[in-house]
Amino acid sequence: MRRRTVLAGAAAALAGCATVEETVEGVTGPDGHPLAGEATVAAVDRSDSGHDLGALAHEAMAFWNDSAARYAGFEVTFRRADDDPPDVEIEFLDGREDLDGCRQYSSEEVLGCAPLVREGTRIERPLTAEVVARRRPYGDVLTTTQHELGHILGLGHDDDPAYVMSNRIEDRLPEYEHRVEVLDAVEVAWETRNEGTRAYNEGIGRWNDGEYEAAIPRFERTRERYAAIVDHVAAAETAAGAFEGMNRPDTVDRPRLESAFGTLRTVADLAVTAAESMRAAAEAATDGDRQRAQDRRDDASGALEELSSIDTPTPADVGRALGLVRELDDEGADAATPGGS
C-alpha cells in the first residue's frame, strides 16, 4: 500500500546519517571524548521555520547537559558561543536538498545528519549538525536536534534514550499508532473526495450533452461521496483524541491538525451543496423547468467558487502536522477539484 511505503520513508527521515559517522571514526586523536567538559554551540538559522530555533537549540543543549553523563558516559556542558568560534554548529535548514554534510551519503528521507564522534576521535571544529526545520512540529525538530547532538556525543541508533536516538519511528513518536490512524482516515477522506469529484465531472459531462436525466444519478453519487468525507474526518478526530495528555505533546502540531479537520469539513459541506444543487438542476431540466434549472445551477456555481478559494489540506499536510514527515508530491490534487459546466 502507498501508506506503508510513505511511513517506511518517514521512519528513515527521523534518523541521522550513519555513513558519515564511519568517515569521522576513522581519524584518531587523544583519549577521551573531544567535547568532554565544556563545549560552545552556535545555532545558525537558514530556514523559513516559524519556530524560535534559538530557544529550541538551547532546549536541546540543556537536555544533553542533564543527560550526557547517564547516556554518553561523560559530563558535557553545552553553552552558547559568543564571539569565539564554536565547537559545534547547529544549522537549521528548509529541506533535505539543503543538507550539505551528508548529501552524498543520505537517502532522500533523511531530515538531519551529524558526525558520530567517538572517544579518541580527532576533530576539526566546528562540528556541524544539520536539521531540517521547515514545516515540521516544534517537538519533532527538537527531537531531531537532540538526536544529531547525540551522534556528536558518540551515541548511535541503538543507544539510549531510544525516544531520541532510535531510527525507528515507533520509538521516537509517542502515540505512533494513533498518528497512523489519523493519517489513514484523512487519506480515505481524500480518496473519497476524489471519487466524488469524478462522479461530479461525469454528471457535468451528461449535463453539457443535454442528457439531464442521466446526470441525476451521477450527481446523487457525488453527494453521497462528499457527505462521507465528514465520517472519515470524524474518525480522524476520534483517533487524535489520544494526543490529549500524551508525553511530548509538541511532537504533534495540534493547531495545524485541528485547522485541517475544520477545513475538510467545510470543503465537504460546500461540495455537498454543489452536488445537491446540480442534482436539483438536472431534475428541473428533465421536467422542462428551465428557470429553476438555471437557478439551481447558479447555486452550484456559487458553492464551487467558494470551494475554489479554499486551500484544502492534503494527506501530506496532515502527515507533517503529525510528525509523520512526507515530502512526496500531494497526490490527487488535480482530480480533487470539481469542474464547472
Which stretches of residues belong to each language-model region?
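Metalloprotease/metallohydrolase-associated module, dominated by Zn2+-dependent proteases
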Residues: 119-121, 126, 130, 135-136, ...
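C-terminal amphipathic alpha-helix
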Residues: 146, 189-192, 196-212, 273-341
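Second-shell loop/turn segments in exported
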Residues: 43-54, 131-140, 214-215, 286
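Structured segments of extracytoplasmic/periplasmic soluble domains
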Residues: 60-71, 148, 152, 156, ...
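N-terminal export signals
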Residues: 2-20
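Metzincin-family zinc-dependent endopeptidase catalytic domain
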Residues: 54-144, 152
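Fold-level signature of zinc-dependent metallopeptidase catalytic domains
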Residues: 24-60
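Acidic helix-start/capping segments at beta-turn-to-alpha-helix junctions
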Residues: 39-45, 73-98, 167-171, 248-255
